[in-house]
Amino acid sequence: MEICKRVEQVDFEKMNGLIPTIVQDYKTKEVLMLAYMSKESLNKTLEDNTTWFYSRSRDELWNKGATSGHFQYVKEIKIDCDNDTILILAEQVGAACHTGNRTCFYRDL
């Protein structure tokens, strides 16, 4: 299926143009992070095979790893049954979390 048709099936309207995106290590299946994608960031992710997200606080797109070198190389992208959440299986280089931890989910509640 071509890229534009795949993107069109995603329901960006439920959350005002954004969609929650879970990133998981493609080998270990460890959950690395959750971020939000816009249609534009999903298109950029599909085009260059690294993760692009939408920063709600900065109101801009960002490429994971562009500053830190901790890129996420996309291996597979899945969408849930409601077409409103994305799961990305990726090869993580270095830490996924801005704190320097491998995963953003390193604390117990």
UniProtKB/Swiss-Prot annotation:
Its EC number is 3.5.4.19. Mg(2+) binds at D80, D82, D84. It is found in: Cytoplasm. Pathway: Amino-acid biosynthesis; L-histidine biosynthesis; L-histidine from 5-phospho-alpha-D-ribose 1-diphosphate: step 3/9. The keyword Metal-binding applies. Its cofactor is Mg(2+); Zn(2+). Binds 1 Mg(2+) ion per subunit. Binds 1 zinc ion per subunit. This is Phosphoribosyl-AMP cyclohydrolase. It comes from Clostridium beijerinckii (strain ATCC 51743 / NCIMB 8052) (Clostridium acetobutylicum).
